[in-house]
Design a protein with these regions (language model features):
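Positively charged, polyanion-binding regions of nucleic-acid-associated proteins
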Residues: 98-119, 294-368
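Short acidic, hydrophobic short linear motifs in intrinsically disordered regions
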Residues: 24-44, 114-139, 232-237, 363-396
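C-terminal engagement modules used by replication, chromatin/transcription, nuclear envelope/ESCRT
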Residues: 164, 168-208, 273, 411-460, ...
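Long, intrinsically disordered low-complexity tandem-repeat segments
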Residues: 458-488
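Short amphipathic alpha-helical interaction segments
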Residues: 48-53, 142-159, 394-408
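Eukaryotic partner-binding/assembly regions in large regulatory complexes
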Residues: 1-91, 167-183, 190-319
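Internal, well-ordered domain-core segments that constitute the primary functional module
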Residues: 107-190
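A short, conserved structural fragment
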Residues: 61-65, 154, 158-169, 258-264, ...
């Protein structure tokens, strides 16, 4: 006889459940919580529930919660690679390029455990030969782009408390590398938890080694992870056993009680919806930058096109998630250095047999919208609202804005870029009546894109930090105000209650 399944938040009273769920959302959406980050007071709120959360994260998701009196860090154990997580490495809203990512790894590797402080001059002396030993990288403080990259990396570490400035100034050094200097205290405990890969990266022969578990182990846990980490999970994207787990009521009850979010079931898949729209690293719809707001307007135009009786949509197969994963691993492996890998310690992927066609779900189909049609829609938006409405960054670059919008909506699993255009995924049509990116006229008569007022139903705002404060789900806000499921698996293309 099997023992009964442990309930999420089993030791939390009804009166305290909201505070517990808020702490869970904080941990999921902030890569590192310290006394100052994301703001003072949050660490104490989270530490109150550390023991209970550690148990629930371990049993529900297989994650490890590291909690001390100084910081809280959730260590995820991945069974799928997610390229949307790149936004965790950014500075002032700008994502790190490969140079900055490489510099970050080299700087962290330069900190000796025996040293509790380091001057910027000493750090540069240690770091420079390491960077120059790597073909195509290098570091020269006389080159502005190199110096700017190092400044961003050190600022990123300061933001997380890994370094604390005790004397001098980084800005002074950036202006004058000969005379400027800074002295930093090193927090080795935080440095140690910032990067905890599944295996030592110097012994990997493939990026597949960054995944902790094979894809077919523990379908229920994989289903929970997909729901927490991705905006929407489509049944056609996952193995049949994972789809069955997603349909199981026990899984939904656990996650709803654990996170305080609303599980929305539809014929095509499942999603965790946040009525407040704050459980996310990419606020949508209605808040955020011009890209987010333009994305809402473009979705509205796409919905108008697909619902036009004179338009006959062209359905095309949606590429399988497994193929996307294989392509991502192949791109990463193409740049993987082979020098220095110790053959006796190296990890290589097992020679697994490819799944038979019968084991793979039938590919879903989605309507195709051509690139030329999308460009026409973008031009119409510029004509309707005026170029100035899209901020100075995009006034003269409508195609660049379109590229950014497509990437943004792709990260939210609403569009799927394919050669020649995009596929419109089912959840995109939740926003057919979008009201969060509306035009209003300024005092000068210029049309402007503005967001709806901030939601008042929930004061918890774990996603409202800089874009680097993310390691969790891209949960979406329900634009129609319909937060729950009707109990029937209607399509994303249908509105509940109709």
């Amino acid at each position: 006889m099997t023992s009964p399944r442990a309930r999420a938040a089993a030791g939390v009273s009804v009166a305290d459940l909201g505070a517990y769920q808020q702490a869970v959302r904080r941990v999921l959406t902030c890569d590192l919580i310290t006394k100052e980050r994301p703001r003072p007071g949050v660490l104490d709120q989270v530490l109150r529930w550390a023991d209970e959360m550690a148990r629930d994260f371990r049993e529900l998701l297989g994650y490890t919660l590291i909690a001390t009196t100084h910081h809280v860090r959730l260590v995820r154990h991945l069974d799928v690679l997610d390229e949307t997580q790149r936004s965790i490495f950014s500075r002032k809203g700008k994502p790190f390029d490969r140079r900055r990512l490489a510099y970050l790894c080299l700087v962290l590797g330069s900190f000796q455990r025996s040293r509790i402080e380091i001057s910027l001059a000493d750090l540069v002396r240690i770091f420079t030969p390491l960077a120059n030993a790597i073909d195509g990288l290098g570091f020269d403080p006389a080159i502005g782009s190199h110096k700017a990259a190092l400044v961003d990396v050190l600022g990123w570490l300061v933001d997380r408390g890994a370094l604390r400035l005790s004397d001098g100034s980084l800005e002074w050094w950036a202006r004058d590398t000969e005379r400027g200097d800074a002295l930093y205290d090193i927090d080795h405990d935080i440095c140690a938890v910032l990067f905890k890969p599944a295996r030592p990266v110097q012994h990997l022969t493939s990026a597949a080694g960054l995944v902790h578990e094979p894809p077919h182990s523990n379908p229920a846990r994989r289903a929970r992870r997909l729901l927490v980490e991705f905006p929407v999970v489509y049944y056609a994207d996952v193995e049949p056993e994972v789809a069955d787990a997603l349909r199981a009521p026990g899984l939904a009850e656990d996650l709803v009680r654990f996170t305080g979010l609303v599980l929305e079931r539809r014929a095509e898949g499942v999603m965790l919806a946040d009525p407040g729209g704050v459980f996310t690293d990419r606020p949508f719809p209605g808040r955020g930058n011009a890209v987010s707001r333009a994305a809402g307007l473009l979705l509205a135009k796409i919905a108008d096109l697909l619902e036009d009786p004179e338009h006959v949509p062209e359905p095309l197969p949606v590429p399988a998630l497994a193929d996307d994963q294989a392509g991502l691993v192949a791109r990463m492996d193409a740049g993987l250095p082979r020098d220095g890998v110790v053959a006796e310690l190296a990890w290589s992927p097992s020679e697994a047999e490819p799944p038979s066609p019968d084991d793979r779900p039938a590919p879903a189909q989605a309507p195709f919208v051509s690139r030329s049609r999308l460009e026409t829609m973008t031009t119409e938006l510029y004509d309707e609202f005026g170029a100035a409405s899209f901020t100075s960054a995009w006034q003269q670059d409508p195609r660049g804005l379109l590229d950014a919008v497509i990437g943004f909506l792709s990260d939210l699993t609403l569009l799927r870029p394919v050669p020649g255009g995009v596929l419109v995924l089912p959840a995109a049509l939740r926003y057919r009546n979008i009201r969060a990116a509306l035009p209003t006229r300024t005092s000068g008569g210029q049309l402007a894109l503005v967001a709806l007022p901030e939601p008042t139903a929930q004061q918890d705002t774990p996603g409202q930090q800089d874009s680097s404060g993310q390691q969790g789900s891209s949960g979406q806000q329900d634009p129609s105000g319909q937060h729950g499921s009707s109990g029937q698996e209607v399509s994303f293309t249908q509105e509940e209650g109709r």
